[in-house]
Amino acid sequence: MFPMVTEFMNYGQQTVRAARYIGQGFMITLSHANRLPVTIQYPYEKLITSERFRGRIHFEFDKCIACEVCVRVCPIDLPVVDWKLETDIRKKRLLNYSIDFGICIFCGNCVEYCPTNCLSMTEEYELSTYDRHELNYNQIALGRLPMSIIDDYTIRTILNLPERKT
């Protein structure tokens, strides 16, 4: 055959193949148009976190025995535990406990290994501030329970997320 005719046939085949690929991509786009939106309007709508969510740490001062297990298991040695040895009863007395959430990686090791369960993870994740020194929480700030998202009437909570089809 003539070289010009074979080039024209190859060009036609490439055009048909390109149109097929464009059509396949367009069909995928149309299949996604039927789904519910995944994004939420954050300050006005909030997701309810799972029970395994690792948020801000809650601390109960009365349960702590100042054993410093939380400091030893922390990958960055973050919790600061100040204690005094009571010589008459031979026990440690906790003076101060603080965590800097600007440095904390929320790994949960301190909560998992605490022998008295004085540490727990809350559902609070809004820790933003303009001054990073405000992220250093002492035992009083750590002892405050966060307001539950469910109980806040100003925020619409989203209970069920649309499930993704894979």
Swiss-Prot record:
Bilayer topology term: Peripheral membrane protein
GO MF term list: 4 iron, 4 sulfur cluster binding; iron ion binding; NADH dehydrogenase (ubiquinone) activity; quinone binding
Short name of any one Pfam family annotated for the protein: Fer4
Chain sites annotated for binding [4Fe-4S] cluster 2: C74, C104, C107, C110
PROSITE patterns: 4FE4S_FER_1, 4FE4S_FER_2
Catalytic activity: a plastoquinone + NADH + (n+1) H(+)(in) = a plastoquinol + NAD(+) + n H(+)(out); a plastoquinone + NADPH + (n+1) H(+)(in) = a plastoquinol + NADP(+) + n H(+)(out)
Single GO BP term: photosynthesis, light reaction
GO cellular component: chloroplast thylakoid membrane
Location in the cell: Plastid, Chloroplast thylakoid membrane
Entry cofactors: [4Fe-4S] cluster
Key words of the record: 4Fe-4S, Chloroplast, Iron, Iron-sulfur, Membrane, Metal-binding, NAD, NADP, Plastid, Plastoquinone, Quinone, Repeat, Thylakoid, Translocase
Assigned EC number: 7.1.1.-
Domain 4Fe-4S ferredoxin-type span(s) in chain numbering: 55-84, 95-124
Enzyme class: translocase
Cofactor note (record): Binds 2 [4Fe-4S] clusters per subunit.
Predominant location: plastid
Assembly and binders: NDH is composed of at least 16 different subunits, 5 of which are encoded in the nucleus.
Family, as annotated: Belongs to the complex I 23 kDa subunit family.
Biological role: NDH shuttles electrons from NAD(P)H:plastoquinone, via FMN and iron-sulfur (Fe-S) centers, to quinones in the photosynthetic chain and possibly in a chloroplast respiratory chain. The immediate electron acceptor for the enzyme in this species is believed to be plastoquinone. Couples the redox reaction to proton translocation, and thus conserves the redox energy in a proton gradient.
Protein name according to UniProt: NAD(P)H-quinone oxidoreductase subunit I, chloroplastic
Organism of origin: Encelia californica (Bush sunflower)
Higher taxonomy: Eukaryota, Viridiplantae, Streptophyta, Embryophyta, Tracheophyta
Gene: ndhI
